[in-house]
Amino acid sequence: MKKLLGSLAAALICTATASAQMFNLRVEAGPVFSFSSLTEHGTKVLSAGTKVGYHVGALADISLTKGLYASTGLSFEMKGTRDHSYLDGKTLKVNKEALNEITIHYLQIPVNVGYRLSLTPSIRFALQTGPYFAVALGGTQNTGLKTTDAVKSFDIFKEGVFGLDKANRFDVGWGASAMLYLGSIYGTIGADFGFLNVAQTDPSGIADQIKGLSLKNSTVYIGLGYCF
């Protein structure tokens, strides 16, 4: 009986060790810099600077072969845009005195394939890339003129962008990132590029002047993380 229990304990330890080598959990957080721009029929609206957001995530790396791994998880991301557009009647116009700001909070699932290289016993470098899938938990738009105190606010998923067509809650895109590990702590830098127009879902019922309104998420981020 003692030999049997000893054998089972040894097997469990070996299994746990193998699982730990194949499956790693990590958490990371940091700022997101959105350089997305509203476009109208392919023409970019005058930017008002980079919008700063955040990302916080919990991820899992699964070892495939030596150095090669797959990674996925969940992250909360704040993205959006800042520009000088405003709606004059049914026409989208640009004025340096106007400020239009869109803020969208996403729950995002990345699916990456990466390669991790050990430089020393405690220093590792990794590169990864792959698609992401995101759903918006909420979004707002504030638009107005700097010369007045009148600011209009919209829930873009209930009232729409500029109070017109409802925004698209879903986004799909492609991302890439690099990570430098110092023991269990790592720093990361990466970028995500959205494929979908998140500004509107069905432009058929709105004014011809802004049927071509488009917003695709484009972000760069940095962060610090901890690998368990």
Enumerate the language-model features and the residues they cover.
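Extracellular/periplasm-exposed beta-strand and loop segments of Gram-negative cell-envelope proteins
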Residues: 35-51, 78-107, 134-173, 195-221
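A glycine-rich, hydrophobic loop/mini-helix early in the fold
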Residues: 72-73, 80
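Outer-membrane beta-barrel channels and translocator barrels
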Residues: 20, 65, 118-122, 182-185
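Hydrophobic core residues within well-ordered beta-strands of beta-rich domains
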Residues: 23, 54, 68, 107, ...
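Structural signature of Gram-negative outer-membrane beta-barrels, strongest in the C-terminal barrel
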Residues: 100-118, 122-138
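Residues on the lipid-exposed face of transmembrane beta-strands in outer-membrane beta-barrel proteins
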Residues: 27-33, 54-64, 74-76, 109-115, ...
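Bacterial Sec-dependent N-terminal signal peptides
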Residues: 1-28, 224-228
